[in-house]
A protein has these predicted regions:
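Acidic, metal-coordinating catalytic segment for phosphate/diphosphate chemistry
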Residues: 28-68
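Unchanged
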Residues: 98-121, 125-183, 187-188, 192-194, ...
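Leucine-biased recognition of intrinsically disordered, low-complexity hydrophobic segments
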Residues: 6, 21-22
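Conserved hydrophobic/aromatic beta-strand scaffold that supports enzyme active sites
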Residues: 29, 49, 70, 79, ...
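Conserved Nudix-box catalytic region and its N-terminal flanking loop in Nudix hydrolases
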Residues: 72-114
Length: 212
């Protein structure tokens, strides 16, 4: 074996170690040869990976990118009420997982079309948010609605334009969405377009946001 420094039983590792090391989507079998994998630190590495000792394949897991945008029309912001878990029934901006083979701006525009049937022009970057516990990076852009022909996509219960004063802050789905919205509005009032950064992580039984 090339990885003798640390070997961890696969089941126990997934339950206890995934928070900082590997994704909680536990891998049991090698996608290359079909044999069982184990979690270990490969030689020359510093983090546990899923390793197949039969064929030697090391399966790397890396953070996922969530791309989204804040579409605006005549001063109002387009929000979607989620039809799926997590946080079903809460409001969010159009956003979702980036696909292979697309640019992050194109992913944000696609998500707006899928979730809100909205045709948007992607603008400057609002925020980059490191959601460390879930191994995600949330990237949110400013956007302009090209028209008001939006509607309810399959992942939304409702889609609506909101004046700043009417945004349902108590019903916003995720801390990352609230961060992006508030920074967007701060910048709009100040007539500027900045990019904002923060980390969201789990401390003492709750999510904590820290600006960078």
């Amino acid at each position: 074996s090339n990885a003798e420094s640390l070997t961890i039983p696969i089941i126990g590792f997934c339950k206890k170690g995934a928070r900082t090391l590997l994704s909680s989507r536990c891998m049991k079998f090698c996608s290359n040869c079909g044999q069982l994998v184990i979690a270990k630190v490969p030689s020359g590495d510093h983090l546990p990976r899923f390793v197949c000792e039969a064929c030697g394949t090391i399966h790397y897991q890396n953070p996922n990118i969530i791309a989204g945008c804040i579409p605006e029309w005549q001063g109002k912001l387009l929000l979607c009420r989620r039809a799926i878990e997590p946080r079903r029934g809460f409001w969010t901006v159009p956003a979702g997982f980036m696909e292979n083979g697309e640019a992050v701006q194109d992913a944000a525009a696609r998500e707006a079309q899928e979730e809100a049937l909205a045709d948007v022009e992607i603008g400057s970057l609002v925020s980059i948010i490191n959601v460390i516990r879930t191994h995600q990076v949330h990237i949110v852009f400013r956007a302009r609605l090209r028209n008001t022909n939006f509607g309810v996509g399959p992942e939304s219960l409702e889609v609506a334009l909101y004046d700043e004063a009417d945004i349902p802050w108590d019903e916003i789905a995720f801390m990352s969405v609230e961060f992006a919205l508030r920074r967007y509005l701060d910048d709009r009032r100040a007539r500027r377009e900045l990019t904002h950064f923060c980390d969201i992580d789990w401390h003492d039984g709750r999510f904590v946001l820290r600006d960078r």
